[in-house]
UniProtKB/Swiss-Prot annotation:
<comment type="function">
    <text>Component of the little elongation complex (LEC), a complex required to regulate small nuclear RNA (snRNA) gene transcription by RNA polymerase II and III. Acts as a transcriptional repressor of the GATA3 promoter. Induces thymocyte apoptosis when overexpressed, which may indicate a role in regulation of thymocyte homeostasis. Sequence-specific DNA-binding factor that binds to the 5'-AGGTCTC-3' sequence within the negative cis-acting element intronic regulatory region (IRR) of the GATA3 gene.</text>
</comment>
<dbReference type="GO" id="GO:0006915">
    <property type="term" value="P:apoptotic process"/>
</dbReference>
<feature type="compositionally biased region" description="Basic and acidic residues">
    <location>
        <begin position="39"/>
        <end position="55"/>
    </location>
</feature>
<feature type="modified residue" description="Phosphoserine">
    <location>
        <position position="85"/>
    </location>
</feature>
<feature type="modified residue" description="Phosphoserine">
    <location>
        <position position="67"/>
    </location>
</feature>
<dbReference type="GO" id="GO:0033085">
    <property type="term" value="P:negative regulation of T cell differentiation in thymus"/>
</dbReference>
<dbReference type="GO" id="GO:0045892">
    <property type="term" value="P:negative regulation of DNA-templated transcription"/>
</dbReference>
<dbReference type="GO" id="GO:0000791">
    <property type="term" value="C:euchromatin"/>
</dbReference>
<dbReference type="GO" id="GO:0003723">
    <property type="term" value="F:RNA binding"/>
</dbReference>
<dbReference type="Pfam" id="PF22623">
    <property type="entry name" value="zf-CCCH_9"/>
</dbReference>
<keyword id="KW-1017">Isopeptide bond</keyword>
<dbReference type="Pfam" id="PF18345">
    <property type="entry name" value="zf_CCCH_4"/>
</dbReference>
<feature type="modified residue" description="Phosphoserine">
    <location>
        <position position="91"/>
    </location>
</feature>
<keyword id="KW-0053">Apoptosis</keyword>
<dbReference type="GO" id="GO:0005634">
    <property type="term" value="C:nucleus"/>
</dbReference>
<dbReference type="GO" id="GO:0070245">
    <property type="term" value="P:positive regulation of thymocyte apoptotic process"/>
</dbReference>
<dbReference type="GO" id="GO:0015030">
    <property type="term" value="C:Cajal body"/>
</dbReference>
Amino acid sequence: MDFENLFSKPPNPALGKKPAADPEERIDEIDGTEVEETQTEKVKWKVKRDREQIPKKFKHLGNAATSPKSLLRKKSRSKDYDPYSDGETCSQGSEDNFDKELQQYIQAKEMANAAQPSLLPEESVKKAGAEGTQQTAKQKNKKSKAGHKKVKQKKMKRKWPGTGDKGSRALLKNSGSREQTDEPEEKQPRVRMSQGFINQHTVERKGKQVCKYFLERKCIKGDQCKFDHDAEIEKKKEMCKYYVQGYCTKGENCLYLHSEYPCKFYHTGTKCYQGDHCNFSHAPLTAETQELLAKVLDTDKKSCK
């Protein structure tokens, strides 16, 4: 019975319905399908058995989709492969080709390494260090050149005495003579200052222009100051407010009065409870201390009002 024609072509409606088949014919059709199924199962079993008989080497090297029937056909075409078995032909040929390719690869790699030898790690480190030292040397040379240029410019600005425009020979002679005699160089003359500048930064004491910043203990130039520091520093006629509170850090260098200030309790006739341990003076009053005491009493009267 043709199954393809039965399922592919639909029934023609013009012809009408076919008469129902007899039960005997239907039994024959069922028997035929069972026979075909058993035959297909036998064929599948034979194919599976043939695959199990093929060696593992051949399975790995060959294509998995090829069936043993196609392999047998290829084998039967050539007579040269008759005396050899399947496993021997495949394994020997593949192993020989692999060994040859491996040897060729090793030889090519050795030739390349011999032609272009790679640097050792020590040599590479030395090379990197040499490059770094070259860069640092270049930077130092640039800095030294810039410094030499500045020194030359300064030397050109200076004029040695007696040289004039005679050139470099006169400079060399003068420098040689100075080195031989070891005479001290003359001090550079002080810069001339205007009278207004002097009056702004000095105070006249005993016919001298004394640095006013020195008198205030604020001069930061010290011995390099252009004005005189030869004077006694007079303290201001005021009481140090930090001394009264007990934490003046300047001590004797403070510009304000500390223990020299007169004690208002002792000099007004009241009892000073501090006694000899008083932080202010119990000495006899002078003209200056009398003025200071009067100022203190005036401030107290104003505060009481």
